[in-house]
């Protein structure tokens, strides 16, 4: 049995037919072709599938697509401007060498984008530690990710002095 759902993904309205068991990550990847949302553990542990649903960071492997009917969903593909201009966070990830293999990067970008947009104090080391503990990276050791987060917070909140 399928259910009709409407998702507003990266500003575009999509009508989908999904089963009751279709995870949001599968709807994004398989039905909409948005493969930037990676699947790692599929148990909500690693954070690679993090997207924003109505502004909140969620593990798309744990959320059913049907639960998101009418919701605004933002994926990593929806971060850059239409002309390809990067966000301050994307630029900081590049400049601070905050990625290596890149598999976890979309999840970190979405996690940190949500935190920045909600005004969370990610420049506070303790808060950033708690936030980053929710996503896993096996390559970077988190140093570049921490620098990128602080740089993006400074640039977004304090002007271009980053």
Regions found by a protein language model. Name each.
Residues 1-162:
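Signature of N-terminal electron-transfer/Fe-S-associated modules in redox systems
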């Amino acid at each position: 049995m399928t259910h009709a759902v409407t998702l507003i993904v990266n500003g575009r309205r999509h009508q989908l037919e999904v089963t009751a068991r279709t995870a949001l990550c599968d709807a994004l990847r398989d039905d909409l072709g948005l493969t930037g949302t990676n699947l790692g553990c599929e148990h909500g542990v690693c954070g690679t599938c993090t997207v924003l649903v109505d502004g909140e960071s969620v593990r798309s492997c744990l959320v059913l697509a049907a639960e998101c009917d009418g919701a605004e969903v933002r994926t990593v593909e929806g971060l850059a401007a239409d002309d390809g201009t990067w966000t301050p966070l994307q630029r900081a990830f590049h400049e601070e060498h905050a990625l290596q293999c890149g598999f976890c990067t979309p999840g970190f970008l979405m996690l940190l984008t949500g935190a920045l947009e909600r005004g969370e104090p990610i420049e506070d080391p303790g808060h950033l530690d708690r936030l980053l503990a929710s996503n896993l990276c096996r390559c970077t050791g988190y140093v570049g990710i921490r620098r990128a987060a602080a740089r993006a917070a400074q640039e977004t909140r304090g002007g271009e002095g980053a």
